[in-house]
Amino acid sequence: MSSGGRGGKRRGAPPPGPSGAAAKRAHPGGTPQPPPPAATAAAPVAEEEDMMDEDVFLDETILAEDEEALLLLDRDEALASRLSRWRRPALPADLASGCSRNVAFQQLEIDYVIGESHKVLLPNSSGPAAILRIFGVTREGHSVCCQVHGFEPYFYISCPMGMGPDDISRFHQTLEGRMKDSNRNSNVPRFVKRIELVQKQTIMHYQPQQSQPFLKIVVALPTMVASCRGILERGITIEGLGSKSFLTYESNILFALRFMIDCNIVGGNWIEVPAGKYMKAARIMSYCQLELDCLYSDLVSHAAEGEHSKMAPFRILSFDIECAGRKGHFPEPTHDPVIQIANLVTLQGEGQPFVRNVMTLKSCSPIVGVDVMSFDTERDVLLAWRDFIREVDPDIIIGYNICKFDLPYLIERAEVLKIVEFPILGRIRNSRVRVRDTTFSSRQYGMRESKDVAVEGRVQFDLLQAMQRDYKLSSYSLNSVSAHFLGEQKEDVHHSIISDLQNGNSETRRRLAVYCLKDAYLPQRLLDKLMYIYNYVEMARVTGVPISFLLSRGQSIKVLSQLLRKAKQKNLVIPNIKGQASGQDTFEGATVLEARAGFYEKPIATLDFASLYPSIMMAYNLCYCTLVPPEDARKLNLPPESVNKTPSGETFVKPDVQKGILPEILEELLAARKRAKADLKEAKDPFERAVLDGRQLALKISANSVYGFTGATVGQLPCLEISSSVTSYGRQMIEHTKKLVEDKFTTLGGYEHNAEVIYGDTDSVMVQFGVSTVEDAMKLGREAADYISGTFIKPIKLEFEKIYFPYLLISKKRYAGLYWTNPEKFDKMDTKGIETVRRDNCLLVKNLVTECLHKILVDRDVPGAVQYVKNTISDLLMNRVDLSLLVITKGLTKTGEDYAVKAAHVELAERMRKRDAATAPTVGDRVPYVIIKAAKGAKAYERSEDPIYVLDNNIPIDPQYYLENQISKPLLRIFEPILKNASRELLHGSHTRAVSISTPSNSGIMKFAKKQLTCLGCKAVISGSNQTLCFHCKGREAELYCKTVGNVSELEMLFGRLWTQCQECQGSLHQDVLCTSRDCPIFYRRRKAQKDMAEARVQLQRWDF
């Protein structure tokens, strides 16, 4: 639903959290009980580091066969034939009938389900077992469901000293008994299937001996890993050894991820099942064209290289729904019907969708190029969409806020209407979609509430969720995001108007359908523009996690996946020590050299460390397995030349003693990035370029996130000894660089000027060499980078990257300058930490700051910038600033009583509700407001007002508030390094003395004032009802009449231009403008022009000839 700038999608609400994760989660075992069609479970907090499997039993989500047969009987045959046009291409005969051909497909989603052991593939097994399901697409576009058997969940513990085969057997019996007690409701014949003695080594700390004995504990079902881990960690009595508690290893890895690691499968790669190694499914369980069973050991996983780096033709469905809300209420599934669903289906890599349709409740006029399907009842609309999903069989479902709004709304609405068969939207036959509330918590992304909608076999890609994770924007409404990335806006129809359009005629419903289609089209445009599919598939390939993990989980799972893969190669195991960071609890962060604030009119060279933190970890061999704890250092008696002592006091062995795993991972990532960038230069094919660019970006992000993984104290494997060592080396290098630059580049050393380091950030230093041309600064920058790089251990390298000229340094992490990489012309104006786009800033601040920086940096005109500020402040005080520039917008995330303190936008929403509940903002809407004049001492929340109400009633705004609370701080930050008395110069003086205040027309005391006519010439009060001019202005009729006519004509032209602009945005020049996008400046200009034009016409009517 997309009303009022995605108002219908609760704009500004927290983003969606985990979508269908690769390891399905519903019930922790026990006797399966069928849930209701859209069971909404409680909201667990799914922290990014918290990884637990929950077993879904195959029978619990399945409708009975005869029940499904009855439901299919009443399907509309005409509709079925209409939908069948969009089916996938038919399977070739040899695949459809036999198993004589290899099956290769690109996998998109991996999950598991609990079912009976396969009698043919596993003749010696019985009882429930985990069956992995891999969903994917072949090169020809055929959908595949591959059911993988025989892979068992397991974990490790350290084997106690002196434990022999007999002891292990007794331990097995004891553990089996404890597991039986803990899982009384389970019908599994054996909980602990076997315990094997293996030789492994822990990843933690340097250990000279090659390996030591571990016990590999194999259990029956994935959830039993957590149950067994709990028993062992709490303590268990072992005959001959007494009571003992164990540290477990690799016991917190999701089952699907464990399978992928052991089978060398990465997210989004190509998998092949050889001919003769698979069986056609005896009982068809999915809607996929090809369903087969095989053993996990028979799968062939291809590396993403050559032909296997290409993309399959995925089917991507982008959809949007519209709901008819009651007056004054945001749509709720318990009351408000779904009235339209727009769908676009595109093949991955193609520019245009091959399916464009809209399903409407009641008749709808035709739309060019769109299949319009009209239905008499809401039930028919919902079932038609369910059938459409089944026939089109999309691999990826996208939209804007679909995980939190559209999909849950459809499921809950079907439940209200008792349409039992609707929630069968996944790829498993008759399996209902499950919805549950979730809360995702991560240090990087914060706490977010969402809904987990499990659509089996289909990846849900919510563009809102992706935007909030990957970009920092002032607003995340679809309108605002589209304007930012696509350079186009869309018509915003407030949810209060949608019901009126629906209840009109087929033409008004067509208007709504066009609007709905645009809201389905824009997410697809954004997906293509931002190369999301390429980038996310490449990130999944690089990090080895399923694609769905990238949206539903945080950063640490990606590093853990790479660490587990490398550890498996080295025969190492990873302990489960979550949240138990060793060593000190905190460490000193990166160095930021003191900023010498000022306006620099000579070129400033920037020297950057290439991948600083990864380089430090590689150079000094910093890893879990190379760390020597203080107590071990004394015992091992390592010679000083064999270890690195870090500036923070830690000890790590050098690579010639033992190479670290983290440095190896980083070397491979950065070498792969170098190859990808080299291939990118050579590549000509646009699809190949997109894949390679996505890959090099994924490799860069992955390398940079390794350091953060070691420093996450609540992460999977925290090690503050590593992270504190990295930052201490970083600090040392920044200070070393500063010293070398200032010691070498001096007049005594033969240079023209003494170099000066004016600022140093985490991984870069800014140097003023004193030369006056960009070209000379570039030469010295390159010389300095080469000279200093030679003093560091490889691969640490200082690079010259750019020149800032001129450069405005405000303070730490706040600066602006012209960015040069070519001495002929600057690339762009670069700013950091300067609030040009903040949610609590009005547009006037952004425009003012941007224009000032342009005048100072590009035009080199500081007096011009000062004069521009003075003129703007004067215009503000004289009420000459367009109201749209003064609008502040904030999201209403909860009701007024739920806020701890009174907020301007919340109080305004309450006042607007009292005026007109039908059009007032509701929870999820963004509330625009301006600050108006009020009694002295009134709080800001008492002075907030609706901009439209202000326009209609001529209410004066409070320019002093904007000057003091919005404009002054950003301006002073820019001008204080340039002007001596910036505050006195800019904010005081003659330009601030003249203030204009408009008279309210219908509020306060003006409600009781008697209005009198004034002369149209000199504004003097005149008596009589029909007079136009006073006695003194008689004789000037022609001049004043022409002036009035000219004023009306000008305002009509202005209004016409703005109206046409809005019509072009809505896509029709023949219909009224309904848009109420309060994020859009044109909206307020149009309203003001309309009001001014009406007032001017009233003046014109007073001329009576």
Swiss-Prot record:
Record keyword DNA-binding present: yes
UniProt zinc finger (CysA-type) residues: 1015-1033
UniProt cofactor note: Binds 1 [4Fe-4S] cluster.
PROSITE patterns found in the cross-reference section: DNA_POLYMERASE_B
Catalytic activity: DNA(n) + a 2'-deoxyribonucleoside 5'-triphosphate = DNA(n+1) + diphosphate
Chain positions covered by the region annotation Disordered: 1-46
Described purpose of this protein according to its UniProt entry: This polymerase possesses two enzymatic activities: DNA synthesis (polymerase) and an exonucleolytic activity that degrades single-stranded DNA in the 3'- to 5'-direction.
Further details from the record: In eukaryotes there are five DNA polymerases: alpha, beta, gamma, delta, and epsilon which are responsible for different reactions of DNA synthesis.
Assembly mode: Heterodimer with subunits of 125 kDa and 50 kDa. The 125 kDa subunit contains the polymerase active site and most likely the active site for the 3'-5' exonuclease activity.
Name assigned to this protein: DNA polymerase delta catalytic subunit
Species name: Oryza sativa subsp. japonica
